[in-house]
Amino acid sequence: MSEEISFVKEIDTGVEGLPKPEVKIENIVATVILENQLDLNLIETKIQDVDYNPDQFPGLVYRLESPRVTVLIFKSGKMVITGAKSINQLIHVVKKLLKAFADQGIPISGKPQIQIQNIVASANLKVYIDLEKAALEFENSLYEPEQFPGLIYRMDEPRVVMLIFSSGKMVITGAKMENEVYDAVKKVARKLKEADAIIGIAE
């Protein structure tokens, strides 16, 4: 099983008569805050696979191949991580990075603080959707098909933004925890059923 496939999760919405949607975490953006400042010149000389061009960008760019994740490292001790596909993978990357620092004698003090900034996910409800009907029933939604083919739905709880397409495909952004993604998909499936906006099962 490839790394891509392993991050697809089938969830049970509890909605009778509907297939189980597939949900995939596409990208997690997180900041990691260390308690001490970092010597970026030292890191550049000690760690492989880093790019540091302070004239172009104030941070150091560290690219990992497995998992395929990018880390921006700043002198202040702040790091920005993009590309993780799960919280567990994100934590693994942080541990891997701190171990690389320790192995090369780069000082790190205290325990890092990890803050999730955004989780982006895709989902397939495996149904066809009447977006006009959904737009009438969904509060805080926008559907202007002449400008964009999907319905934009701003959910209050969990606080996420969803792009919903007539094919049953969706994009979810703004989540801070993986469970918020799954809760949002379950909730929107129920709302679509209640709105009578599901017009067929996708094969």
Swiss-Prot record:
PROSITE patterns attached to this UniProt entry: TFIID
InterPro entries the record matches: TBP (IPR000814), TBP_archaea (IPR033711), TBP_CS (IPR030491), TBP_dom_sf (IPR012295)
Keywords: DNA-binding, Repeat, Transcription, Transcription regulation
Superkingdom assignment: Archaea
Keyword Transport: no
Protein family according to the UniProt entry: Belongs to the TBP family.
Entries under NCBIfam families matching the protein: PRK00394.1-1, PRK00394.1-2
The protein, known as: TATA-box-binding protein
Source organism: Aeropyrum pernix (strain ATCC 700893 / DSM 11879 / JCM 9820 / NBRC 100138 / K1)
Classification of source organism: Archaea, Thermoproteota, Thermoprotei, Desulfurococcales, Desulfurococcaceae
